[in-house]
């Protein structure tokens, strides 16, 4: 692979990754915000601490049922108006892998097995990672400043 092909591949990777982030940021934020709003309601009903309740609900994210995962995935496709989300995820995985392969194998032609997650699985993984980060810093969602 010559240096121009690599540069083009790097540009494509950056663009696909930027597009994917742009598509996911607001819908994922809205999803986490809805978890916080549910925590507020639950905390009022049970007289528990809102942030502890928020953390409790966030900790359930990795264990979401397939129906919940698919519902969130479909919601994200609708609100982001991105019916090509699965293709975008695939493009990001392929571009990243091609760059890593070009660096690792130099001029050798070697077949690489690439497991690309489904769109729903990828979105659930993003939710899980975001939930972990917000669990560590729940004050980011407080409304009482």
Q: What label would you give each PLM region?
A:
Residues 1-114:
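Extended alpha-helical interaction segments
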């Amino acid at each position: 692979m010559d240096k121009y092909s690599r540069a083009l591949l790097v540009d494509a990777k950056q663009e696909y990754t930027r597009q994917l982030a742009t598509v996911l940021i607001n819908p994922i934020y809205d999803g986490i915000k809805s978890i916080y709003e549910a925590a507020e309601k639950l905390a009022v009903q049970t007289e528990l601490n809102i942030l502890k309740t928020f953390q409790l609900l966030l900790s359930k994210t990795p264990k979401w049922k397939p129906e919940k995962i698919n519902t969130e995935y479909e919601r994200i496709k609708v609100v982001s108006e991105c019916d090509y989300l699965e293709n975008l995820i695939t493009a990001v995985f392929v571009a990243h892998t091609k760059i890593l392969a070009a660096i690792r194998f130099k001029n050798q032609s070697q077949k690489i097995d690439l497991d690309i997650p489904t769109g729903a699985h990828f979105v659930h993984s993003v939710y899980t990672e975001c939930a972990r980060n917000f669990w560590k810093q729940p004050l980011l969602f407080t409304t009482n400043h």
